Amino acid sequence: MGFQIEGVIPALITPFTDDLKGINEEGLRENVSRLLEAGVHGVVPAGTTGESSTLSHAEHRRVIEIVVDEVNGKVPVIAGAGSNSTREALELSTYAEDVGADAILSVVPYYNKPPQEGLFIHFSKIAEAVECPIILYNVPSRTGCALEPETAAKLAEEYSHIVGVKEASGDLDVVQRFIEETPDDFILLSGVDELTLPILAVGGVGVISVTANVAPELMVEMYEAWKSGDVERARELHYELLPLHRALFTETNPIPVKAAVELVGMASSPPRPPLKEAREDTKELLRRELKKLGLLPEGG
């Protein structure tokens, strides 16, 4: 397996124009630049946090293109390229590969609830269409069905460039089953910020993170502390960050994180309908937690 990634990988928000009808391209570039300066280990454009479900196909492609260009090889770009239509997932995946994404993140098809055999067919077709590394994305709370570890193991055995999984079930037992069932070099990335440290402890190698949009340095510090063997410091940071992790999920993601990104002075916007702007009590909670961590700009 050639592709390796570990560490803190922000799942980028997509900032929209004021009327929500277009992408704030300059703001997206500024956000990526800020996160690179903070030392993140990769980025994910056009995922759940990036509102892929309400991007047009042209916008989805453009977001990937912008991020690949702005990153310019500094860290891996893992492009969100999933869909509940296998045909559309193929189109997005081949486009992401063509414009230079280092890997693709391919979500379990949502809404139509395929059986495991259907998931195997879906991901097999994607693997046969691209040569770039593929990271599977298991998030049953958003998709309505789960990728079983045994299915992931079959896919990894059949296709050497299916290299890992973003595991966002929130169930540590499921995480451990993925690690037990898949090859030793299969990458497991946490998809739940508050479980990052526990998942590292059982064999995960990093996190595709919502929190890292607003607290990238702290997330990187926690990971680096763990990696260097300073478990006590990693644990301290884990508990310091927990209230913020929780605050970022008091409403449907990415409603809170888009408010938080604005609070820390980065480019943001409300989400597109059918999501909406964060409630005032959510904004106040976020403001308090960000302030505790010293993340608000002066006067914020």
Swiss-Prot record:
EC number: 4.3.3.7
Disulfides per UniProt: none
Keywords: Amino-acid biosynthesis, Cytoplasm, Diaminopimelate biosynthesis, Lyase, Lysine biosynthesis, Schiff base
Family annotation (PROSITE patterns): DHDPS_1, DHDPS_2
GO biological process: diaminopimelate biosynthetic process; lysine biosynthetic process via diaminopimelate
Cell compartments where the protein resides: Cytoplasm
Location of the active site: 137 (proton donor/acceptor), 166 (schiff-base intermediate with substrate)
Catalyzed chemical reaction(s): L-aspartate 4-semialdehyde + pyruvate = (2S,4S)-4-hydroxy-2,3,4,5-tetrahydrodipicolinate + H2O + H(+)
Site (Part of a proton relay during catalysis): residue numbering on this chain: 48, 111
GO cellular component, one term: cytoplasm
Superkingdom, natural source: Archaea
Gene Ontology molecular function terms on file: 2-dehydro-3-deoxy-phosphogluconate aldolase activity; 4-hydroxy-tetrahydrodipicolinate synthase activity
UniProt: pyruvate binding residues: 49, 208
Pathway the protein acts in: Amino-acid biosynthesis; L-lysine biosynthesis via DAP pathway; (S)-tetrahydrodipicolinate from L-aspartate: step 3/4
Function comment: Catalyzes the condensation of (S)-aspartate-beta-semialdehyde [(S)-ASA] and pyruvate to 4-hydroxy-tetrahydrodipicolinate (HTPA).
Subunit-structure text: Homotetramer; dimer of dimers.
Similarity section: Belongs to the DapA family.
Name used for this protein in its record: 4-hydroxy-tetrahydrodipicolinate synthase
